[in-house]
C-alpha cells in the first residue's frame, strides 16, 4: 500500500518499523514547543495523504473513510508523559503537518526531546455505519458485566 508523504521540515524522518512484524510505524519529533505548563507539542515535520491506489484498494465497492491514528509508544511510561487524547485521529482529508501533544504528568521524569521517537502511526479504515435505535439488545454471555468482569 502506498501513502503519499510530504516532508515539511528537512529533518523529518519518514515513519518506519524496526521489525516487519511491528503493527505501527515509529515517528520522530523534529521540533518541540511548550504550549502551557507541562503541555508539549512535538511536530513530526511531515504531512500524509492516502494514495489513489490505496483509496481504491481499501474502499473497493463499499463506502468507507481512511484515517491514520497516532498512538503512544509502549515505552512512554519512562517519560511520565501522556498523549493528550490517548489516540489521535488524523482524518483522510487533513493534509497539514502531523504533530503530537503530550501532557507531562510526572515532571520529575524525563520528557521527550527533538530527535526522539515520540509516537507511532497506524492506518485505519472506518466503514460507514448507521445507528438504529431499538428497545432491547440481544442477550450475550457477558451481558451487562462491565469493568473488571473478566477477572485479574
Spans of features found by a protein language model:
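DUTPase catalytic domain/fold
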Residues: 1-152
